[in-house]
């Protein structure tokens, strides 16, 4: 892994996404500028934290960060653009939503969206960069809450448990009940459930 050198600027934003793999719902992104004067203990990749810990950290991040913002791309945008381009768009929206313009942006992963300031992609950034860890927590808590809300409307699919990912249970219910308007029609299993696959 390439050694990560932290940029020598004051206002660094971290950006991460949640929800590229699910068959349903938006891809959700977050951008966070942390306050060096108000450190947050225990930041890590959201997937390595318990749900309870994520919820506590989410509130602390919102309270202590200099600026934070959420972005998203809806299922119809994912279907129109493809998941990669929709994710880049959602990241651009998260950065644009910051009320303080960052001097530098660190993106989790291996590619950066076009931004009006310098940026760098950091592989496994959600475990290596506190700003990206914070962004991953905000994005995951937000998307998980959306899946729990969708589960109330469509209880037969089990969205609260699998968060829209293509588990055996989700695929079984998709075949049984068909797709909701929140499913991504360009994704193979959804296409097949709708009889659109060639």
Curated annotation (Swiss-Prot):
Pfam families: RNase_HII
Keywords attached to this entry: Cytoplasm, Endonuclease, Hydrolase, Manganese, Metal-binding, Nuclease
Binding site for a divalent metal cation: 16-17, 108
EC number from the UniProt entry: 3.1.26.4
GO cellular component: cytoplasm; ribonuclease H2 complex
Broad EC category: hydrolase
Superkingdom classification of source: Bacteria
Cofactor(s), by name: Mn(2+); Mg(2+)
PANTHER family assigned: RIBONUCLEASE H2 SUBUNIT A, RIBONUCLEASE HII
Function of the protein: Endonuclease that specifically degrades the RNA of RNA-DNA hybrids.
Listed name of the protein: Ribonuclease HII
Gene name per UniProt: rnhB
